[in-house]
């Protein structure tokens, strides 16, 4: 692919590993795993972050996948995400499967401290064959450093059970 990658393992699964992956056309460094509240004896949830090596800019990129069948854990995980990153001086982009629709508490909680890339449109991403739910998001902070150029759901149904979101953001100078 010609892309740079980092992988954060969550669990061993069926002879391999399951976790969060980050891909970038820019070099990635300093992979950090931020464990989220939940059920440690099951699939532990996390935010995986990397520094994106951009010329003259400081960007932290993260990915997450919140708990799928426990609303209380999802809300606690959203709060932990904000608590972990709210005081950092870096520009941060966070993408992931929140397993929650826009009106649900985890999304409402994150929007208190983060800007969401696609708040003006309903970008349904799940299930992949006939998307009827918006549960995947791209957030960023602080809001005055990036400008949204575009965002869209890509009609691709092979790589995942979710459709991907493509967003173009640019630095505000």
Regions found by a protein language model. Name each.
Residues 15, 69, 99:
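Glycine-/small-residue-rich active-site loops that bind phosphorylated ligands and cofactors
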Residues 63, 95:
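Generic enzyme active-site microenvironment
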